[in-house]
């Protein structure tokens, strides 16, 4: 395997000229075979989104089978916009990120995957949040997986950086105080690369040693109060603190005014904060898929704010028709929102379910064959015993006086991603 694609593989692949970089005849992503960006299903993935009660649906999603011209490769992503133009930014990133990443994979994989001058050692650049199974392939002495991971990680980082630059140059989208999260993955054969930006989440449904289906979180919500994120933000003169009305929600603020109060430490857009610690560098991790791994769920925080990882995995596993899995998760999340928080506005929800074994997605939507999800008696209505993972639950070697118990999200947040838009003509602090 070595790198993403060997030289021989690249020559042998029959990729339509319109689907790769070069020339003016490139086909738009919307016309690409195997690409789904709305409610529906393909051979190995299903998608569903539903607007909440806060206004325009700012969530976006995509699944692209036969990605990169390979029958064994799929790209998936969900994007949660915020701010006045968050819906436009989420859709823009959804539409351009996969193709930009595809271009860079072709560029990078034929050369040395990572320059030592650009990126330090592999172990230093691994996510400080990833579980041991998602950390450096070199730990297992697998050189070919290290090369694959290095090359793909560099492609992810370049693609995210380039997309952020494109957003800044967009004249028809104001991204000064608007942005989006992104949790994305590429599955190529048994290799899985996850790139995460913000607080959307990827969760794996896998079998444990007792053959019980359990949830394994592949990403960690990148919040401003994680020690490493907070140190970077403060070095850049940004501020991290919780508003008095939301003492449990740390936010990122401008140096001299109490805005915008962004509830994440990494995002596309939000250029008013890019000089003050907000970054668009993805947290990239690697995992080898095994026969025990059954599916992956990508979802925005409208789902994770009310359902635990295990509840989502249980819902997907209980669906008789895989086409309905994503919709079943959204249905349960909406039901739980209404039950738990009857006075709160339901958040937008977007879900992508990627199935890892050989069986294809079957069934249909509600009212069609295959839609009879046996949901676990709305288990989300009762407070789960399992603790939602936060950055502080993972030891990154930093000195922190905050214990895991103090940070456990036993209750669920219903926060707005942005609290206030900055007034750039007035640098005096605003009163809250």
Curated annotation (Swiss-Prot):
Essential cofactor(s): Mg(2+); Mn(2+)
Q: Which family does it belong to?
A: Belongs to the PP2C family.
Q: Which residues form the PPM-type phosphatase domain?
A: 44-356
Q: Which reaction does it catalyse?
A: O-phospho-L-seryl-[protein] + H2O = L-seryl-[protein] + phosphate; O-phospho-L-threonyl-[protein] + H2O = L-threonyl-[protein] + phosphate
* Keyword annotations: Hydrolase, Magnesium, Manganese, Metal-binding, Protein phosphatase
| Entry's Gene Ontology BP terms | regulation of intracellular signal transduction
Q: What is its EC number?
A: 3.1.3.16
Which of this chain's residues are annotated to bind Mn(2+) 2? 80, 301, 347
Classification from the root reads: Eukaryota, Viridiplantae, Streptophyta, Embryophyta, Tracheophyta
- Gene source species: Oryza sativa subsp. japonica (Rice)
Which GO molecular function annotations are given, in alphabetical order?
metal ion binding; protein serine/threonine phosphatase activity
Cofactor: binding comment: Binds 2 magnesium or manganese ions per subunit.
Its recorded name reads Probable protein phosphatase 2C 75
Disordered: region residues: 372-408
Checking SMART domains in the record gives: PP2Cc
**Which residues are listed for Mn(2+) 1 binding in this entry?**
80-81
């Amino acid at each position: 395997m070595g790198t993403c694609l060997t030289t021989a593989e690249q020559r042998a692949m029959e990729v339509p000229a319109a689907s790769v970089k070069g020339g003016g005849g490139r086909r738009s992503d919307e016309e690409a075979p195997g690409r789904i960006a709305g409610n529906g299903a393909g051979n190995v993935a299903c998608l569903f989104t539903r607007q909440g009660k806060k206004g325009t649906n700012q969530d976006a999603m995509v699944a692209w089978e036969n990605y990169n011209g390979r029958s064994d490769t799929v790209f998936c992503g969900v994007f949660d916009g915020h701010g006045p133009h968050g819906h436009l930014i989420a859709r823009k990133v959804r539409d351009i990120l996969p193709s930009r990443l595809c271009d860079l994979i072709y560029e990078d994989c034929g050369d040395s995957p990572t320059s030592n001058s650009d990126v330090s050692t592999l172990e230093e650049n691994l996510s400080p949040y990833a579980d041991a199974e998602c950390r450096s392939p070199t730990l297992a002495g697998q050189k070919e997986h290290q090369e694959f991971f290095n090359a793909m990680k560099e492609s992810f980082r370049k693609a995210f950086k380039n997309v952020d630059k494109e957003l800044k140059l967009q004249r028809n989208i104001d991204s000064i105080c608007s942005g989006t999260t992104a949790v994305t993955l590429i599955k190529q054969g048994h290799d899985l690369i996850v790139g995460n930006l913000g607080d959307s989440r990827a969760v794996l449904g896998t079998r444990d040693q007792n053959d019980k289906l359990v949830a394994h979180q592949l990403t960690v919500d990148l919040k401003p109060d994680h020690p490493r994120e907070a140190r970077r933000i403060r070095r850049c003169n940004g501020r991290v603190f919780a508003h008095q009305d939301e003492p449990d929600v740390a936010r990122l603020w401008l140096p001299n005014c109490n805005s915008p109060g962004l509830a994440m430490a990494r995002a596309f857009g939000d250029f008013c904060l890019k000089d003050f610690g907000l970054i668009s560098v993805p947290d990239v991790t690697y995992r080898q898929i095994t026969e025990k791994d059954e599916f992956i769920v990508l979802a925005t925080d409208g789902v994770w704010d009310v359902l635990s990882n295990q509840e989502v995995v249980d819902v997907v596993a209980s669906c008789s028709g895989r086409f309905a899995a994503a919709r079943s998760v959204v249905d349960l999340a909406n039901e739980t929102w209404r039950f738990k928080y009857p006075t709160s506005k339901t958040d937008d929800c977007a879900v992508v379910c990627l199935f890892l074994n050989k069986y294809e997605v079957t069934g249909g939507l509600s009212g069609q064959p295959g839609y009879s999800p046996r949901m676990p008696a709305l288990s989300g209505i009762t407070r789960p015993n399992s603790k939602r993972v936060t950055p502080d639950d993972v030891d990154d070697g930093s000195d922190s006086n905050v214990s895991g118990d103090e940070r456990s999200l036993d209750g669920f947040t219903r926060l707005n991603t942005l609290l206030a838009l900055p007034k750039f003509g007035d640098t005096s602090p605003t009163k809250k």
